[in-house]
Amino acid sequence: RSLAASKKQYHLLAITPSFVQGEYWEAISEGIDKAASEMESYNITITKLFFDQYNNKTFDDIIRNLLNEKVDGVLIATLFTDSVIRLSQELDRNEIPYVYVDSNIGGQHQLAYFGTESYDAGVIAARLLMDRLSSSSDILMARIIHSGKNDSNQGKNRREGFCHYLTETGFNGNLHEVELKINDSVYNFMKLDEIFEANPNINGAVIFNSTCYILGNYLKARGMQSVKLVGYDLIGRNTQ
C-alpha cells in the first residue's frame, strides 16, 4: 500500500542551526524545503526547528518539549554531542526513528548519517597545510565563540584529526590558539593582531568550521597573503 493512497499523516522534525544568507546551513535548510515539497503528496509534513550553533542551551530548549506532540521521525544536526545523545536515547525509548546530519556519533541507533568523516577531514586539512609549510612553522588554530564556548562535535573531530596528523608526521613548530567572535570584526582584528605580532613564525592557519572568511578577511586586510589558510565549506564568503 503506497503512502500516497494512505490517509495517515506523517510528521517529521528537522533540528538544525539558524543561519544568515550565504551560510553553510542555508543550503541544508533549502534541501529540507525541497524534500518537504516533494513529500507533500505523500501526507508527510516537515517542521523545521532552529537553534544557535554557538549556544548549547538553545538546542536543549528546543528538545525539552519535543515529544509533547506527535512525531514520526527526526533529522538532527549533531553539533552538541551530549545533548544529541540524550535526545537520541529519548527517541529510542519512544521508538521514533532519527537520522544525523553534519557529523556522526557512534554508539547510537540512527538510521543513517549524512555528511563527511570529520576526523578524516581534519587529517586532510593538516596534510594540505603541511604540503605548503616547513615542519618548523607555527600554525594558528582559530575557533569561533558566541553565547558560550561550545565546540561542535564536527569541530572537535576535525581538530583531533588535524593534530594527530601533525604528531604522526614530525611537526615541530608551535600551535597557537585564538578565540574569535562571529560578528565582531573589531574584536577579531585586535586578537589576531596581538597573536601575530607576538608570534612572527606563524605561517599557517586553520579554522574547523565554515567561517574561514573571518580569518581570510583579516589576512587580506593586513596584506598577509603569505600565511597559508585552510578552512571548510564552499560558501560564497569563503571563496571570494
Residue ranges and their predicted role:
Residues 113-139, 188-189, 236-240:
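Hydrophobic alpha-helical segments within soluble ligand-binding/sensing domains
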